[in-house]
């Protein structure tokens, strides 16, 4: 049986169908590319995606297979129609651009190391990818009474800190008419969204860590990185989105 393989190099341009639709390839599926995604593509010409850079010292041995499995399972839950989790691990990582060819050798990208890298590999190749959790009690709001330092893949960081924050989170029962509602101090999804945002948009070229500070009445998340070029306090609301990491 004759098999013909055709390889087409990317030319950096964006193309549409005859109906004017712009599609992106994910696994075996073609999905629509939305306006915010297209603006990210265009902005990457002036602002290259740091998270997409290849780590020259990395190899496929730096991949933690358990983290790959965890990433697949979370994707399966989020998008049950996605075929990406059905791919073998290497094809899965290629499609997500977590690994790329560096000449003839496949290596991890910054994003790849952050999502599926081994703990020792993160400490060796990207030691600034650190999250420090500090807990403050009502008796002393100036000095923390518990600390946790993490240099782990992003999913593990989110899972561990969610568990830690929830351990100190209380539930208040509120009566609304005939219904009794449970209101958490720190809802899990809200905390995870805030933490993921901080981890995704931090400046990984800075040596500073992300700090998660939990007080009795609030959680404060601090991440390194100032405004990108062209963005100021005055135009941050109206300025087109320019992501630091995609």
Model-based region annotation:
Residues 1-23, 30, 118:
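Divalent-cation
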């Amino acid at each position: 049986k004759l098999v013909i393989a055709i390889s087409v190099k990317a030319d950096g341009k964006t193309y549409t169908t005859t109906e004017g639709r712009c599609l992106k390839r994910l696994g075996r599926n073609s999905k629509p590319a939305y306006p915010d995604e297209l603006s990210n593509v265009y902005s990457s010409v002036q602002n290259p995606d740091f998270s997409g850079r290849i780590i020259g010292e990395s190899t496929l041995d730096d991949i933690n297979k358990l983290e790959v499995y965890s990433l697949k399972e979370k994707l399966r839950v989020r998008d049950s129609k996605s075929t990406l989790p059905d791919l073998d691990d290497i094809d899965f990582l290629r499609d997500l651009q977590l690994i790329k060819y560096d000449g003839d050798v496949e290596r991890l990208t910054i994003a790849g190391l952050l999502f599926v890298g081994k703990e020792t590999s993160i400490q060796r190749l990207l030691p600034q990818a650190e999250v420090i959790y500090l807990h403050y009690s009502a008796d002393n709001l100036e000095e923390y009474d518990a600390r946790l330092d993490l240099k782990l893949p992003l999913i593990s960081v989110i899972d561990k800190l969610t568990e830690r924050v929830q351990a100190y989170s209380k539930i208040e029962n509120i009566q609304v008419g005939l219904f009794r509602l449970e209101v958490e101090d720190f809802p899990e999804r809200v905390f995870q969204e805030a933490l993921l945002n901080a981890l995704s948009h931090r400046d990984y070229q800075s040596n500073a860590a992300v700090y998660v500070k939990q007080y009795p009445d609030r959680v404060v998340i601090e991440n390194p990185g100032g405004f990108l070029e062209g963005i100021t306090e005055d135009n941050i609301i109206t300025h087109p989105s320019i992501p630091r990491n995609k």
